[in-house]
C-alpha cells in the first residue's frame, strides 16, 4: 500500500519558459528544503527534467512549487511518471 510517507521516485518533465530563468536552481533549493534527493537537468528540447526521490508527500509538495516556478519562468505543462528506486542519490544537484 502506498502512503504519503513511502519513499518514492518521480521523473518529472517541465515545459514552458523554464530554461535561462533560474528554474533548475529554484528546483534544487526547493527540493533540498523538502529533504528530497535527485537532480534537475536542462534538455535539448527546452524542457527541464527533474528526478526526485523521497517521501511521496514531499514530492507532491515539490510539484506544487514547480507549477509556480521562479519569477521569470512560465510553466506550461508538467508530466510526472512514478518509478522504482533504481539509483540512490545523496543530495539534490543540477545535472549538466
Curated annotation (Swiss-Prot):
Alphabetical list of InterPro entries matching this protein: Acylphosphatase, Acylphosphatase-like_dom, Acylphosphatase-like_dom_sf, Acylphosphatase_CS
Enzyme Commission (EC) number: 3.6.1.7
Domain of life: Archaea
Gene3D superfamilies to which the protein is assigned, alphabetical: 3.30.70.100
Keywords, sorted A to Z: Hydrolase
Reactions accelerated catalytically: an acyl phosphate + H2O = a carboxylate + phosphate + H(+)
Family: Belongs to the acylphosphatase family.
Name under which the protein is recorded: Acylphosphatase
Organism: Methanococcoides burtonii (strain DSM 6242 / NBRC 107633 / OCM 468 / ACE-M)
Taxonomy of the source species: Archaea, Methanobacteriati, Methanobacteriota, Stenosarchaea group, Methanomicrobia
Gene name of the encoded protein: acyP
